[in-house]
Curated annotation (Swiss-Prot):
<dbReference type="Pfam" id="PF11414">
    <property type="entry name" value="Suppressor_APC"/>
</dbReference>
<feature type="region of interest" description="Disordered">
    <location>
        <begin position="121"/>
        <end position="146"/>
    </location>
</feature>
<feature type="compositionally biased region" description="Pro residues">
    <location>
        <begin position="137"/>
        <end position="146"/>
    </location>
</feature>
<dbReference type="InterPro" id="IPR026828">
    <property type="entry name" value="Suppressor_APCD_1/2"/>
</dbReference>
<protein>
    <recommendedName>
        <fullName>Suppressor APC domain-containing protein 1</fullName>
    </recommendedName>
</protein>
Amino acid sequence: MESPGPGGPPLVQAPYTVLLLPLGTSRQDPGAQNFFLWLQMMQALEREQDALWQGLELLEHGQAWFADRLRETQQRQLQLGALGEDFLMDLHSETDAPLLTRIQKVNACLHSLIHKELSKHRKGVTQSTGEVVSQAPPGPKGPTLV
């Protein structure tokens, strides 16, 4: 079990001990079966937690990467605006279409994952409270029109 660091991945791995007690000699022993199922669920939850930590770290790196590409694109846009009609003379005016396609695929995958989770959460809230939640998630706004 890991304890999260301030605003980031886990800093310290907390030790723990697993104690296995014999519950009987039969595989059909209900206590042994329940324990085995519990242990399997705990392991699955630990794997999910590890994957979530990895995803969070990737998102942090991804956010920095996206911010850098956004700044570069804005700079290129300003340069292109400054060139005016002479933009054909600039060799750096070419866009990177394959990169754009990959970015759009990543955005679509993230949107799909987040939208499915928000839908599940909202259904749970609606069922438990009886009212519909219609609030947009916080965060930066979409693309800016020029």
